[in-house]
Regions:
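Conserved nucleotide-sensing/catalytic segment adjacent to the nucleotide-binding pocket
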Residues: 2-68
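Short hydrophobic alpha-helical runs that function as membrane-insertion/retention elements
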Residues: 4, 75-76
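Short, well-ordered beta-strand core segments
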Residues: 47, 74-75
Length: 189
């Protein structure tokens, strides 16, 4: 299965909490990385790309790539909130380990939420209640924002993966199944 990891190329996880050590490349360097990655892919085979906004951190996805992504069919991944919470806590362990960085990221949310909500989230972070914080962010911030943008509305759903957990092992098994399914769809013989 061919993948294009835009977050790795942009050195950013694509959210307010997405900054990575070392900072982001310049826009030109990001576009060069994207071009290099695309040039190594087989254009006759499908490419799987995580749904991203047109901006990853401070970097803009090249418009032609963004248009292709916006028109592409969708592979939905569905998981219980508890699994998503555990995955989020593990994925963002680096920012959680830096209380000042976590507080700064949370302080940037007030334009989206009431001050009391932000204060509650900051208090959760300060006392190390990271699972509670992740659950709140998923249920109150990210899921509603995703529903509001409707990024996938009207796009065909190529596959729907229902996962009970998002551990590295479960994700590897899901990726293998997805790759096999994409190969079958491409070569139905």
């Amino acid at each position: 299965m061919q993948t294009l990891d835009l977050e790795a190329l942009a050195a950013h996880r694509g959210s307010l909490f997405g900054a990575m050590p070392g900072g982001q490349p310049s826009q030109k360097a990001f576009e060069s990385r994207v071009h290099d990655a695309l040039s190594r892919l087989d254009p006759a085979r499908p490419v799987v790309v995580e749904a991203e906004s047109s901006k990853i951190g401070a970097r803009l996805v090249p418009p032609s790539l963004w248009a292709a992504m916006a028109a592409a069919p969708v592979i939905e991944i569905v998981a219980p909130v508890e699994a998503r919470v555990a995955h989020t806590v593990a994925t963002y362990a680096d920012i959680a380990a830096d209380p000042a960085a976590l507080d700064l990221a949370l302080s940037r949310l007030p334009r989206h939420h009431a001050r009391a909500t932000i204060s509650e989230w900051r208090a959760m972070a300060a006392r190390g209640a990271l699972s509670d914080l992740a659950r709140q962010l998923i249920e109150v911030h990210y899921d509603p924002a995703y529903r509001r943008t409707g990024a996938d509305r009207g796009r065909p759903v190529l596959d729907r993966l229902v996962l009970e957990d998002l551990s590295p092992a479960a994700l590897a098994i899901a990726a293998q199944g997805l790759a096999a399914g994409l190969d079958r769809a491409r070569d139905p013989a």
